[in-house]
């Protein structure tokens, strides 16, 4: 693996997608081979799994089913899109990766971080990011952002109550502590322009 694998993590409404859309042209202008992708999704099979995971009517989905579907989507995305790009020396910017599963299914759903981590170690063959940026934000602020975004389709996870979203953030903070060697916490409750500048600085300082 020759490229650089940067993952962007955060709760709902933390600004991950907007951030990545801004990072992409910046690194392109620097003549850096760069690719943006997302989880779950990024390729046809994983996008189909994303549709299943996000369907509002699938409220009966059991936590283990959810965790395994995310891991399956992750596996296919990794081997079909991420690894080939890394082998071609790309900087890969990925919206979510393993840490999402640890926070959402491992902690918030109560499956246990260690169990979910083992599922994903199997799925990814221990492929881990070069760097992870965690966008930290209070759940109330993130959900308020989502409510104001008329263009965003509300998914099954968005519909969870506030206690779930608080557990997600608690889980993320534990993940940050556990993997402090590769995760950098950035305050997402700031103007997007400043957030972009800060994240660019982190990536360039750590990797480039």
Curated annotation (Swiss-Prot):
Sequence positions that bind ATP: 10-17
InterPro entries attached to this UniProt entry: P-loop_NTPase (IPR027417), Thymidylate_kin-like_dom (IPR039430), Thymidylate_kin_CS (IPR018095), Thymidylate_kinase (IPR018094)
Enzyme class: transferase
EC number: 2.7.4.9
Recorded GO CC terms: cytosol
Keyword Kinase: yes
Record-level GO BP terms: dTDP biosynthetic process; dTTP biosynthetic process; dUDP biosynthetic process
UniProt keywords, alphabetically: ATP-binding, Kinase, Nucleotide biosynthesis, Nucleotide-binding, Transferase
GO molecular function: ATP binding; dTMP kinase activity
Catalytic activities: dTMP + ATP = dTDP + ADP
Family annotation (Gene3D superfamilies): P-loop containing nucleotide triphosphate hydrolases
Record function comment: Phosphorylation of dTMP to form dTDP in both de novo and salvage pathways of dTTP synthesis.
NCBIfam families, alphabetized: DTMP_kinase
Family the UniProt entry places it in: Belongs to the thymidylate kinase family.
Name assigned to this protein: Thymidylate kinase
Species of the source: Bacillus anthracis
Gene that this sequence comes from: tmk
